[in-house]
């Protein structure tokens, strides 16, 4: 049984809450953009972190994802976690923790930041600071 919120469910939730139609960014599976009623642009990034054997989630935020999120008026990240939990954060809040000293590189993701997600905070590999967060349990878009 899949206990993760689907990407489609996230889109329905976000579009309803933000009163905005979101379209997929070309060639980007988890990035969506729209224009809210104020005329500002909105970008949503919704990765599905993996559970680490040590009991936290991990996900990479790539330099390309960061570029797209930086080019919008409002950037939001909706992390889809096991147990139908959702973690929603503003890009401007997260990017303060994504320093140049924390950047990693590999052939697959290229330049990226590695995020470790816990129930009450996010830890970026290479950064001693933690970002406090609060998980939300998702039941349905109704």
Regions found by a protein language model. Give the residues of each.
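Acidic-basic catalytic patches of nuclease active cores, encompassing PD-(D/E)XK
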Residues: 1-40, 48-50
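Residue-level detector of beta-strand structural context in well-folded domains
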Residues: 30-32, 77, 113
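A generic structural signal for short, non-catalytic loop/turn and secondary-structure boundary residues
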Residues: 37, 70, 82, 106-110, ...
């Amino acid at each position: 049984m899949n206990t993760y919120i689907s990407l489609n469910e996230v889109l329905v939730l976000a579009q309803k809450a933000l009163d905005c139609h979101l379209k997929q960014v070309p060639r980007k599976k988890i990035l969506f953009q729209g224009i809210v009623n104020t005329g500002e642009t909105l970008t949503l990034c919704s990765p599905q972190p993996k559970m680490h054997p040590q009991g936290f989630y991990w996900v990479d935020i790539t330099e390309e994802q960061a570029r797209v999120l930086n080019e919008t008026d409002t950037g939001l990240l909706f992390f889809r976690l096991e147990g139908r939990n959702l973690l929603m954060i503003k890009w401007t809040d997260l990017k303060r923790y994504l320093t140049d000293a924390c950047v990693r590189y590999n052939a697959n993701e290229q330049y990226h930041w590695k995020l470790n997600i816990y129930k009450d905070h996010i830890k970026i590999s290479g950064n001693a600071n933690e970002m406090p967060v609060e998980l939300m349990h998702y039941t349905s878009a109704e």
